[in-house]
């Protein structure tokens, strides 16, 4: 009978003998449970034999699954640490996880930070599923790696011209890590990325992290539209400003918009005032949906020169499908008129 039992154990545990560790976990777990139903005297040394192979297989399987999913290896490592906490394989869990985290943290500074941060996110989830006392410090290390990686990924996407993805990544970074010293710069890059998605010239370089010295020129933006407007701008400085709806303002025809908008004497148009250093700027006028969900956003570029005060007017053009498209407004502003391009949107 013992010889037949040995043959049985060998047959059931064959995946372990073949080093197919993930496939070996279930049959080894079954063999380990047999002393609960079979006389231990009959089993002899076989009663304790599955412990070592099962611990080894749980470890090897967990390692093979690291990085392969949102919590790769967590189930195997968790079972190992709970069932065989003093085993040699259990003592290897923290070192191997630490080594993997360190490797991905280093990759954040490389050519593909986005791939590195996704791997770090999976490692962080794996660590979070394990007993903290058995993987000390690794949750903090992985979390810091994800934080650095999210920022690096957003910057990388901006520099690669993937502006919509850059905006999403850096908006998330700024919301998640409000106390991070890079949050303000992340918001600036996200603004520039949103503008660049409509006007690629705005994405040729990252926004400056600091504010330039020297004189500032005033830009007064008026809203002659029945819907609110958010104005995004980037250049020597980057930011946003929101204008309230003009309650009694109407849409213009294509023929009258550029000559009549913001021209009613004494009318109190909603206004915003910006103080801008000289330089080239890119603007995105985002019309709200209060008046019509079909109002388009509009992007433009202008140059701010020293010694001038500038104005800009935003308005909405009513356009039928039979009317021709409006021409693109000029990119460069000649300061003789002291006025930025008038930002009209059509619907």
Question: Which residues does each PLM region occupy?
Answer:
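Alpha-helical protein-protein interaction scaffolds
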Residues: 1-200
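Disulfide-rich extracellular modules and peptides
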Residues: 24, 116, 248-251, 264, ...
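Hydrophobic beta-strand residues in large extracellular and virion-surface proteins
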Residues: 24, 31, 62, 166, ...
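Primarily secretory-pathway and cell-envelope proteins
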Residues: 48, 87-90, 95, 99, ...
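Generic detector of contiguous secondary-structure segments
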Residues: 215-222, 266-275
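An anionic, turn-rich surface loop/hairpin at beta-sheet edges
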Residues: 252-268
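A short tyrosine-centered beta-strand micro-motif
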Residues: 259, 268-270, 274-292
């Amino acid at each position: 009978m013992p010889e037949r039992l040995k043959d049985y154990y060998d047959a059931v545990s064959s995946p372990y003998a073949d080093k197919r560790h993930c496939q070996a976990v279930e049959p080894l777990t079954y063999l380990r449970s047999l002393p609960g139903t079979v006389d231990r005297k009959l089993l002899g040394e076989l009663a304790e034999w599955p412990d070592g192979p099962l611990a080894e297989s749980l470890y090897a399987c967990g390692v093979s699954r690291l990085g392969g999913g949102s919590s790769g290896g967590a189930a195997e490592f968790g079972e190992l640490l709970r069932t065989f906490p003093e085993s040699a394989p259990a003592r290897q869990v923290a070192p191997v996880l630490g080594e993997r985290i360190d490797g991905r943290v280093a990759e954040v500074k490389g050519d593909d930070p986005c791939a590195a941060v996704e791997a770090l996110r999976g490692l962080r989830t794996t660590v979070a599923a394990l007993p903290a006392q058995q993987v000390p410090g690794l949750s903090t290390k992985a979390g810091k790696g994800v934080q650095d990686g999210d920022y690096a990924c957003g910057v990388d996407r901006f520099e690669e011209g993937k502006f919509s993805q850059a905006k999403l990544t850096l908006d998330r970074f700024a919301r998640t890590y409000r106390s991070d010293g890079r949050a303000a710069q992340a918001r600036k890059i996200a603004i520039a990325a949103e503008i660049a998605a409509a006007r690629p010239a705005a994405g040729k370089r990252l926004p400056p992290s600091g504010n330039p010295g020297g004189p500032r020129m005033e830009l007064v933006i008026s809203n002659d539209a029945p819907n609110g407007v958010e104005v995004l701008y980037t250049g020597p400085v980057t930011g946003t400003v929101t204008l309230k709806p003009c309650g009694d303002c109407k849409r213009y025809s294509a023929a009258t918009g550029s000559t009549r908008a913001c021209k009613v004497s004494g009318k109190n148009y909603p206004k915003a005032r910006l103080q801008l250093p000289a330089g080239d700027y890119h603007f995105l006028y985002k019309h709200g949906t209060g008046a019509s969900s079909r109002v388009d956003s509009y992007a433009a570029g202008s140059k701010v020169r020293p010694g001038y005060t500038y104005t800009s007017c935003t308005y909405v053009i009513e356009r039928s499908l039979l009317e021709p498209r409006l021409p693109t407004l000029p990119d460069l502003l000649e300061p003789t008129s002291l006025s930025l391009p008038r930002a009209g949107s059509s619907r």
